[in-house]
Amino acid sequence: MILRFRSKRGMARAEFQPTDTLAMLSAKILSDILKNDYSPENVSLCQNESDQGVIFSNLNDQTLQDAGLTHGQMLYLRLGTPNSDIASSNNEPALTVTGAPKQVSTPDVSEKKPSMPVIQDPIDDSLEKEDGLIRRSMTSLCRHGPKGMCDYCSPLEPYDESYRQENKIKHLSFHAYLRKINSNVNKYASSQSFIPPLEEPSFTVKEKCPSGHPPWPAGICTKCQPSTVMLNLQPFRVIDHIEFASPGIVDSFLNKWRQSGFQRIGYTYGHFEQYNNVPLGIKGVIEAIYEPPQVSEADGVTLEEWADEALVEQVATACGLRRIGIIFTDLTDDGSNSGKVLCKRHSDSYFLSSLEVYNSANFQTKFKNPCKWSRSGYFGSKFVTSVISGNLNGEIEVMSYQVSNIGTALYQADLIQPSVDPDRMLVKKEDQTRYVPDVLYRYTDKYGKQVSENAKPAFPVSFLLVTLTDGFPEKPDPLFSNNDTSIITTLESTDETGRLRQLAKLFDHNAIANGSLSNFSVLLAIAKLSILGKDDLAALASYATAPTEENEKNLNSRESYQTLLAILYSSL
């Protein structure tokens, strides 16, 4: 059998027997094709150009036939540092810069290994137990009985390319992508030599270079400098869909804009569930929106210091929620008195401005996604940015996005900055404190050819975006029966006695029966009184979100809750 190999050195082919082992294949490639210019530790075997591949030194004695290799198959060789460069870097001084500062490089995130076992999100642990196969029914091409199976009806892998194209799925789900990468990276490796298939991109200069030269900017070599950045459409997305538990959540958030005409911003709180519209998909279910202190204007919002952040997080945790994103408005009435708004964001302008993408990258860096399949223990983020704006028909619409992993890596390396043009992101200039690698972006021209362009000094911000879908459930079953956030404004506009009096009305028997406590803003207002302890607040949250007889008895048995009732009733 003849196998073909492609690498940065060109094309080559070699003849093997089906009974030859992978170890024999690697030895022949190193000697006959690479002319012993590379060591086994610096060459990886890949099935396609996007794979990380398997290092030659990790290939075992599995036969080529058992490994699934066929006559004429194209394989790819990922080449590392040649032996000549390794020898020269060990014997010769690296490039130095006279008079440069001693130490200004940033840590290489990808080199960090998790020091403790990674605790993933429950949704990730749950999806890892799913087989993820796409079931297919019998077709007219099948020639077997109901208990048989053939190529036309056998289940497909969750990352099957034909299924993705037929169903117009733009991005693979994260777990489908993970299985695709893992099957390629660890296909030939034994169970004793597992290789983490995921690695977060890093575009910073490595601090501890094995060449022994002074750190950047006093010295740099091919081992420690970041590689060229190629901006492409990210093939996967960590979150596939955003679902608002009820339309009232968005409607309540929009009320302040309707009343003032000023823009608003808020943090979304919810949880993650499996999304069945794509194989192994994840959706974020938003149950509440909290609006932090802000200065609103007609054309933007400025966030102020958030003193109650820890308390809001505590209340959210008590309700079984977590912060999953941020949402803001960009609405301008079109002046027709018909309820329609201007369409500002579309394919000919922008979807998220460069400043918004920059801020989203900042949030995604703070809220990383723990992942045991990554070398660093983290991969991507589940933090989602949603914007409420006008569509092409002048209707108010929610659109959700994430910044790609390369986008967040560029932000972490301090290589990008927003520009005055909302559709363009600037690449920063290199200086004594910042090494800037080559940045390219690739697009399809009018002739259908792939064209690469230099991203300096600026590039389209759309290359950093990942688009999500969003919507509402067919049968809403929200965690909170009441989404009115005006209670916060009412309480903040009165004195202490007035606040207690307003809260006391919510504990009336008839009011409780109508769901007065089933409101995230109300629970937060009660928590601000500092009467209930952490466990008692959790008991109140359990009753507010699930008003069962058992939860009611548990709440009434708590001394601090009775103290709260006494204080509130005394204000009436």
UniProtKB/Swiss-Prot annotation:
It is a peripheral membrane protein. GO terms for biological process: ERAD pathway; mRNA transport; protein transport; ribosome-associated ubiquitin-dependent protein catabolic process; ubiquitin-dependent protein catabolic process. GO terms for cellular component: Cdc48p-Npl4p-Vms1p AAA ATPase complex; cytoplasmic side of mitochondrial outer membrane; cytosol; Hrd1p ubiquitin ligase complex; nuclear membrane; nucleus; perinuclear region of cytoplasm; RQC complex. Keywords: Cytoplasm, Endoplasmic reticulum, Membrane, mRNA transport, Nucleus, Protein transport, Translocation, Transport. PROSITE patterns: MPN (PS50249). Residues 242-379 form the MPN domain. GO terms for molecular function: ubiquitin binding; ubiquitin protein ligase binding. InterPro entries: MPN (IPR037518), Npl4 (IPR016563), NPL4_C (IPR007717), Npl4_Ub-like_dom (IPR024682), NPL4_Zn-bd_put (IPR007716), Ubiquitin-like_domsf (IPR029071). Gene3D superfamilies: Phosphatidylinositol 3-kinase Catalytic Subunit, Chain A, domain 1 (3.10.20.90). Residues 87-116 are annotated as: Disordered. It is found in: Cytoplasm, Perinuclear region; Endoplasmic reticulum membrane; Nucleus membrane. It comes from the Eukaryota. Belongs to the NPL4 family. Involved in the import of nuclear-targeted proteins into the nucleus and the export of poly(A) RNA out of the nucleus. Has a role in the endoplasmic reticulum-associated degradation (ERAD) pathway. This is Nuclear protein localization protein 4. It comes from Schizosaccharomyces pombe (strain 972 / ATCC 24843) (Fission yeast).
